[in-house]
Amino acid sequence: MKVTTLALPVFASLASANPVEPRQSCPQVYIFGARETTVSQANGYGTAAGLVNMVKQAFPGATSEAIVYPACGGQASCGGISYDQSQRQGTEAVVRAVTDFNRRCPNTKIVLIGYSQGGQIFDNALCGGAGSTLSGSALQAVKAAILMGDPRYVAGLSYNVGTCQAQGVSHLSR
């Protein structure tokens, strides 16, 4: 009888404990995509969609998500959000999304694909220029960044290193 009396409070406390969260399945490759200015969030990746899909096909099991940010340039249809505000919000969204994902899936290789303002927000998150930047394990998890039509691009500068087949991007000066 004493065993039952002692065991009952123990089992009762276990029943009231928070349920165990199911483990998330982590892909080997995860792609973050970002659309260009004036393309609605409903269009997800914008012009970068084709490339996002090509990378997913090249790496079976790879998954992706679009960065949620305004992608505005001051137009009325965007509530007048300026380009500067939009790219700052986008950069913050990148840092938050990549960091959060990396915490959940620390061994997943991350690919960033963006076009125009979408490329710029990834550029900012990697190299600085608009608020916070990726750091630590989240930065180390980024294995590829494809920035097409990036407004920050200036031909001939030292950070224009490599090609699609060799080397890569070195960090911009902050």
Model-derived regions, located:
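Fungal secretory targeting signals
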Residues: 1-23
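Membrane-helix exit/interface motif
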Residues: 98-102, 124, 130
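Lipolytic serine-hydrolase domain surface
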Residues: 150-174
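Active-site nucleophile loop of the alpha/beta-hydrolase fold
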Residues: 36, 142-153
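Extracytoplasmic/secreted cell-surface and envelope-processing proteins
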Residues: 40-43, 76-77, 120-124, 154-158
